[in-house]
Amino acid sequence: PALGSAIAPEDPFFTIVTYRGAFGNTNNWLNDWTALSDNNFLGDLVDPLTTADCTNPIRITDADLVAGETYTWTKDNCYVLDGLVFLEEGATLNIEAGTTIKGAFEVTTGDNTSALIVARGAQIFANGTADEPIIFTAELDDPTDPDDVPNPQEARGLWGGLIILGDATIARPGGEDGIEGIDADEPRARFGGTNDDDDSGVLRYVSIRHGGSALAPGDEINGLTLGGVGSG
């Protein structure tokens, strides 16, 4: 079904497929007869998704990313975020197309969920492609199997998500605030400032799945959270 893990109707009019939405990645029924096809609005077909083996992933904790350093995560590895992992001021994270990053199912750091937080002054460059998207998902998820988390109610909130914080103007007294879902005393979780041209990096062909941890009533981490991100 188009919305993902919904239960398929029993009506024989419908055909069960292995992809989400109206179009598969091996054929497109709009090709060669529609105006969209004639005017080259249809993208190229892509190969079936393949991901790195996550049997022995690289486990990333907050201590592994240091301010001012540059890091590169590659598609031949699988990365698991254990707890709240901050990319600190002055640090850069490059993520290769086709890379899979997962939020830990069992957090060992004492945090109540897993998330990647790009702090003010840090940059993330996640340049995926149509053939090789960058996938952020839960540790329990196999991105190549659309049916491994069959219950829609169980498919959300399996980890925190991706949080990007910038230095642009926000509508808060004093010009800054702390992002929801993280301890108010954590200085790296502050966002907002005076630089509307602030540049936090690039997200391109990035898929974020099964995120959105509910920490308490009215307090959660969304799959993707942007706070004070500038136009740079």
Where are these regions (language model features)?
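Beta-strand/loop edge motif enriched in small/polar residues
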Residues: 1-232
